């Protein structure tokens, strides 16, 4: 259902957007700018990472044994605490100690990206679109230039999805690793005399997906995440807003939209039925709207999921190999092999196993 403007309508005043038309140029994604703006004013995004989003709030910790859950999630907390409580004073101290001596923003961008790559990040630069920032969190993004950073999730763990035999849960360590390393990149920027503010991967204050696409790092996949040429669908995102006008990257057309329309293995394999086959209009964007409530409710009852990522041939066989095969033959590499696999779904609250086709109630 679309929103409509009317007299006396209550709206939320947001900071100006440097380039609100940038989203209109994303390959393979249709955007209604007027509706997107209206949603931002009338019904802006709310801060809600999946475990805290009603009606499944606290479902994840309730359905897990603390002895299993705490060792996985506890290491992800310190980077978030530093982000919320300490980085602002750290920023003031470091930029005062290291005044900026160069105004060459192009060189600064190269140095930042080189350092980020040494820590395992892919990176791109775009302008912050505050329509995709949660209500009340504009102050957490004090600058318009945003460096988007992506880190690869471990392929060997994801290949076990959804029955993670190599460990109890999927790769939660990515949140600890990327969380601390994004602060290291931020401190590198501060040592160049540039003020900045970092956001860690486990964060509901901003929609990373759209900014990663705007920064030219990948395209929107059918499963709702970004597909990159380096890692396919298996990365987690973080970002840094900084007080410098770095040269911007542009969205890229990798042919992913057409490939996903032909593939849709994530749709066929999703055990929760959370990924629709057809696109719909959602908050001004024409896309496949993932039912995140159904997705997370299912995820919470199992020892992880990640079936949508594991079903993606771009993850299994490599981006270039799959896209080259599709360009030559018009066929999806490994499709029949992936469809023939049986899912073994293990409930978190017991060692009971459910086979593909059975429902979890």
Predicted regions and their residues:
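Non-catalytic, usually N-terminal nucleic-acid engagement modules in DNA/RNA processing proteins
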Residues: 1-164
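Flanking helices and flexible, charged tails adjoining ferredoxin-like Fe-S electron-transfer domains
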Residues: 1-27, 281-361
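Compositionally biased, intrinsically disordered low-complexity regions
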Residues: 10, 30, 220-223, 234, ...
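Intrinsic-disorder/low-complexity, polar/charged segments
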Residues: 104, 108, 172, 180, ...
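Catalytic cores of enzyme domains
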Residues: 113, 122-333
């Amino acid at each position: 259902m679309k929103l409509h403007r009317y007299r006396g309508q209550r709206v939320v005043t947001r900071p100006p957007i440097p380039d609100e038309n940038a989203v209109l140029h994303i390959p393979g994604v249709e955007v209604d700018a007027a509706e997107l703006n209206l949603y931002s004013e009338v019904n802006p995004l709310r801060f809600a990472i999946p475990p805290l989003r009603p009606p499944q709030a606290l479902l994840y910790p309730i359905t897990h044994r603390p002895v299993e859950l705490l060792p996985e999630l506890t290491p992800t907390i310190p980077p978030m605490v530093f982000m919320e409580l300490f980085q602002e004073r750290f920023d003031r101290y470091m930029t005062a100690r290291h005044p900026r001596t160069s105004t060459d923003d192009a060189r600064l961008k190269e140095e930042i990206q080189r350092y980020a790559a040494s820590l395992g990040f892919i990176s791109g630069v775009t302008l912050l679109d505050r329509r995709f920032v949660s209500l009340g969190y504009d102050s957490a993004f004090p600058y318009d230039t945003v460096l988007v950073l992506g880190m690869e999730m471990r392929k060997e763990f994801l290949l076990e999805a959804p029955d993670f035999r190599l460990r109890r849960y999927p790769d939660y360590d990515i949140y600890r690793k990327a969380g601390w390393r994004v602060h290291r990149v931020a401190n590198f920027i501060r040592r160049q005399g540039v003020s900045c503010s970092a956001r860690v991967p486990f964060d509901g204050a901003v929609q990373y997906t759209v900014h990663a696409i705007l920064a030219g790092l990948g395209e929107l996949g059918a499963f709702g995440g970004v597909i990159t040429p380096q890692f396919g669908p298996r990365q987690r995102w973080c970002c840094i807003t900084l007080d410098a006008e770095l040269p911007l990257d542009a969205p890229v057309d990798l042919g992913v939209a057409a490939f996903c329309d032909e593939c849709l293995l994530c749709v066929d394999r999703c055990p929760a039925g959370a990924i629709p086959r057809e696109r719909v209009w959602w908050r001004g964007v024409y896309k496949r709207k993932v039912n995140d409530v159904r997705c997370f409710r299912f995820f919470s009852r199992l020892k992880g999921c990640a079936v949508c990522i594991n079903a993606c041939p771009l993850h299994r066989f490599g981006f270039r190999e799959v896209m080259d095969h599709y360009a030559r033959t018009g066929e999806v590499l490994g499709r029949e092999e992936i469809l023939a696999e049986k899912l073994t779904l293990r409930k978190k609250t017991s060692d009971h196993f459910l086979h593909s086709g059975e429902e979890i109630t």
